[in-house]
Amino acid sequence: MERTYLMVKPDGVQRGLIGQIISKFEQKGYKIVGLKMMQISREVAERHYGEHAGKPFFNGLVDFITSGPVVAMVIEGKDVVTTAREMMGATNPLKAAPGTIRATFGVDVGRNIIHGSDSLESAQREIGIFFKSEELIDYDRAIDTWIYE
């Protein structure tokens, strides 16, 4: 099974959307294997968004992601990286497909509620930034036989 990294950004936390967002992934059948609320330091934010260093929006992105608490999580399931991205919707909420998290809750590209890894490689890197291996829990769920063949 694949794992991916998701983060409810400060706007999602401040607006009280944590539970609704987590529920969408659980209802889809994905298993949460790591979950924590945290305040991201500037150093961690710069490492996380390192691929954007030097771009005009980099400092604003780092400022925003460190402006309040976030909820970091790792979810597991079949094709979870691709499907989670589809569930989140386009980066710009105004262009996101109806029913996606960003279309439902977002109103501005700079306040788009959630981050999700865009590839397996990114997921592994981001999980390593935000979680120690002992913080990720492997466990069996009774419902898995009803979700996967």
From Swiss-Prot:
Reactions accelerated catalytically: a 2'-deoxyribonucleoside 5'-diphosphate + ATP = a 2'-deoxyribonucleoside 5'-triphosphate + ADP; a ribonucleoside 5'-diphosphate + ATP = a ribonucleoside 5'-triphosphate + ADP
Keywords, comma-separated and alphabetical: ATP-binding, Cytoplasm, Kinase, Magnesium, Metal-binding, Nucleotide metabolism, Nucleotide-binding, Phosphoprotein, Transferase
CDD domains with a match to the protein in the record: NDPk_I
Role of this protein: Major role in the synthesis of nucleoside triphosphates other than ATP. The ATP gamma phosphate is transferred to the NDP beta phosphate via a ping-pong mechanism, using a phosphorylated active-site intermediate.
Active site, renumbered: 115
Protein name: Nucleoside diphosphate kinase
One GO CC term on file: cytoplasm
The organism's place on the tree of life at top rank: Bacteria
Cofactor entry: Mg(2+)
Gene3D superfamilies tied to this protein: Nucleoside diphosphate kinase-like domain
Binding site for ATP: 9, 57, 85, 91, 102, 112
InterPro entries: NDK-like_dom, NDK-like_dom_sf, Nucleoside_diP_kinase, Nucleoside_diP_kinase_AS
Family, as annotated: Belongs to the NDK family.
Major site of localization recorded for this protein: cytoplasm
Keyword Calcium in annotation: no
EC number: 2.7.4.6
PROSITE patterns in the record: NDPK, NDPK_LIKE
Compartment annotation: Cytoplasm
Subunit details: Homotetramer.
Single GO term (MF): nucleoside diphosphate kinase activity
GO terms, biological process: CTP biosynthetic process; GTP biosynthetic process; UTP biosynthetic process
